[in-house]
């Protein structure tokens, strides 16, 4: 680990580093022109989108937005929340459409064509760690919600997004950020011509001790190298990215420990928690005549020390454990979109296939004391291969009516080699998923949508093979590897074509099995079938040249199916999420942004007897640009509210306690944080 960190550190020190949230990205080599605003949310989607909840975010939407952590990039998606229940190097906690998505169980991310979510992961199924992304290099984010889109497969029942990085930068820059608690972030990036193409690079280093009583001691290194140009007359994009991080964690803590004065809100019980992780990836995107080819390879490692229950299961040594995951990921996709006719009806035909192979050499769980392993609970290896194929036909039935018929097929084959022989074995699974969408244009400003589709998420494939519980030695029943879901949506989109748009979507979503967080195991497990229905509203208004306003709200009702009323609530699922922002942006001058994010209270038990409180956070950012320099100031949690990012209800046992105690375990939101940003354009 030290060798990898050192290599990236050397790369960073050979260039001038610094930080700010502003992004500049016009094509290199173009003549200098006056900077203009490009708001992704103002892009015209009438006649293009297939659902009311589909959208695009990018450009100035990102560059003017103060964020506390990388994962908050996805909060540009209406109704999406990213929080944290442990250390800064771990994947975040996500919420959307009444889901507690844990670390990404039903929401997928693709980064320059590469899937981000990890399946059959040591910590959580669908683990979506975005810490390897450099926010300033994300040009555009395309998102969609619901299982209505044939080109998207696993972990996409609630939604998905595809992030695209810049091909080139208008100007290189170096940035420096200084924050409280010894926070320093360096970033430098530039692009230049190489032969007939353009080479872009970026190097980042971030370190902080955080505001918790236990120093987080974060050391993160990021790098990216991207070539855009022709390779043998084939338009290509080749990207190499490298990420390496170590950190110390303060996990969620029991409410009783704070109320008794044992610790304060930012205190800790176990000082040994934390982890390390790396991800090295190579992606290629190629335009082959009528076909688009995408290839990717990734090497990944994570070691995570956790202890949610303290002394519950082992009063002598404690419950601390390590989860370890090491793997190689290989895969790709091939797609083709053409305009044709069927019986004289104009049709857009989109067909494609994708393949993914995970070779997991370390899939381990150990009991630990002081981060030292003393007992192996599981040591597994896994191979998981999936092949998907899809097709959809968009019929332009009239000048106003579009109908899209789609179908997707997914096949999974997997093999587990376990330390306990009874848990070794292999199997396969497959499923078909039909999709249908209608779009009707009332006029040039107003479009109606209706959607239906089936989708799925995969389970950790060990649950399809296991016959013995490795922790207790008791018999264990196997479960399906692939879990179906179905959903429908109706809505509309209104766009003045002059800087104002407005969407409303009414949705329903049924799952055959919910992925649930299990506190005393520190992981996710398949649960009961569920149903959700809700409504979403999103609006963007470019009031005038420098001033823009956005607003979104989502209200969802969710419950487990098959249980009586009063015993069927879904824990940790927020039914109301709202966000709004006001941005004033003058090129070569002042930029000011004020954003508010709210999520409602949530029940923590199926009988609704225990709840967590709501959260409302206000972020503020201001910067001034003059010639080659820019100075900025971000104030996160402006009102310094004592809200909670996350809370759970489960049993734990402190060192001084003789019995287990059921309690709320919470992780506080960040204190007010002030960051000073300095940028120099190269």
Residues of each region from the PLM?
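Gram-negative outer-membrane beta-barrel transporters
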Residues: 336-338, 343, 396-399, 403, ...
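Transmembrane beta-barrel wall of Gram-negative outer-membrane proteins
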Residues: 173, 178-207, 212-250, 273-285, ...
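Short acidic/polar hinge/loop motifs at secondary-structure boundaries
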Residues: 115-145, 164, 479
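C-terminal beta-signal and adjacent terminal beta-strands/loops
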Residues: 549, 601, 623-682
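Short strand-turn segments of transmembrane beta-barrel domains in outer membranes
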Residues: 142-150, 159-192, 211, 481, ...
């Amino acid at each position: 680990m030290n060798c990898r960190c050192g290599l990236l550190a050397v790369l960073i020190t050979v260039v001038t580093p610094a930080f700010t949230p502003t992004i500049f990205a016009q094509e290199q080599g173009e003549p200098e022109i006056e900077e203009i605003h490009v708001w992704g949310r103002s892009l015209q989607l009438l006649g293009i989108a297939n659902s009311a909840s589909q959208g695009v975010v990018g450009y100035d939407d990102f560059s003017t937005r103060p964020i506390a952590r990388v994962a908050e990039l996805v909060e540009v998606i209406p109704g999406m929340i990213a929080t944290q229940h442990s250390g800064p190097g771990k994947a975040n906690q996500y919420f959307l459409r009444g889901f507690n998505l844990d670390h990404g169980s039903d929401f997928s991310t693709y980064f320059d064509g590469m899937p981000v979510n990890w399946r059959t992961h040591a910590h959580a199924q669908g683990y979506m760690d975005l810490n390897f992304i450099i926010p300033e290099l994300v040009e555009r984010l395309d998102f969609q919600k619901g299982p209505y889109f044939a080109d998207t497969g696993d972990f996409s029942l609630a939604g998905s997004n595809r992030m695209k990085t810049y091909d080139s930068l208008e100007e290189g820059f170096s940035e420096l950020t200084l924050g409280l608690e010894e926070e320093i972030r360096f970033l430098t990036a530039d692009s230049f011509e190489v032969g007939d193409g353009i080479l872009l690079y970026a190097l980042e280093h971030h370190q902080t001790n955080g505001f918790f009583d236990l120093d987080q001691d974060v050391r993160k290194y990021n790098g990216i190298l991207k070539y855009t140009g022709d390779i043998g007359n084939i338009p290509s994009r080749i990207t190499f990215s490298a990420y390496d991080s170590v950190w110390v964690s303060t996990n969620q803590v029991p409410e009783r420990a704070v109320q008794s004065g044992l610790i304060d809100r930012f205190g800790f019980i176990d000082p040994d928690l934390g982890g390390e992780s790396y991800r090295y990836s190579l992606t290629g995107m190629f335009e082959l005549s009528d076909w688009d080819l995408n290839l990717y390879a990734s090497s990944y490692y994570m070691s995570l020390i956790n202890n949610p229950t303290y002394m519950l299961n082992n009063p002598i040594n404690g419950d601390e454990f390590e989860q370890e995951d090491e793997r190689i990921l290989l895969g790709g996709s091939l797609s083709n979109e053409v305009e044709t006719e069927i019986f004289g009806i104009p049709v857009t035909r989109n067909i494609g296939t994708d393949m993914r192979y995970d070779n997991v050499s370390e899939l381990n769980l150990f009991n630990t004391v002081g981060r030292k392993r003393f007992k192996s609970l599981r040591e597994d290896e896994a191979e998981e291969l999936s092949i998907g194929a899809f097709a959809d036909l968009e019929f332009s039935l009239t000048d106003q009516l579009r109908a899209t018929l789609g179908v997707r097929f997914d096949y999974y084959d997997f093999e587990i080699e376990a330390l306990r022989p009874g848990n070794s074995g292999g199997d396969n699974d497959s499923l078909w998923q039909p999709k249908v969408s209608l779009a009707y244009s009332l006029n040039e400003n107003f479009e109606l949508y209706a959607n239906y589709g089936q989708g799925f998420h995969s389970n950790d494939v060990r649950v399809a093979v296991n016959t013995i519980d490795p922790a207790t030695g008791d018999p264990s029943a196997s479960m399906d590897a692939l879990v179906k879901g179905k959903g429908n949506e109706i809505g509309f989109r209104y766009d003045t074509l002059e800087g104002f748009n407005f969407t409303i979507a009414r949705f329903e979503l049924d799952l055959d099995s919910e992925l649930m967080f299990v506190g005393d195991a520190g992981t996710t497990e398949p649960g009961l079938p569920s149903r959700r229905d809700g409504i979403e509203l999103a609006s963007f208004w470019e009031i005038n040249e420098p001033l823009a306003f956005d607003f979104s709200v989502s209200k969802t009702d969710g419950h487990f199916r098959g249980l009586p009323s009063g015993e069927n609530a879904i824990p940790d699922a927020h039914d109301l999420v709202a966000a709004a922002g006001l941005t004033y942006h003058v090129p070569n001058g002042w930029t000011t942004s004020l954003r508010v994010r709210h999520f409602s209270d949530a029940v923590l038990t199926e009988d609704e007897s225990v709840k967590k409180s709501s959260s409302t956070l206000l972020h503020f950012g201001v910067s001034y640009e003059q010639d080659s320099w820019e100075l900025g100031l971000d104030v996160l949690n402006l009102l310094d509210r004592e809200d909670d990012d996350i809370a759970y209800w489960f049993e734990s046992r402190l060192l001084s306690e003789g019995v287990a105690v059921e309690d709320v375990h919470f992780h506080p939101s960040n204190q007010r944080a002030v960051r000073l940003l300095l940028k120099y354009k190269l």
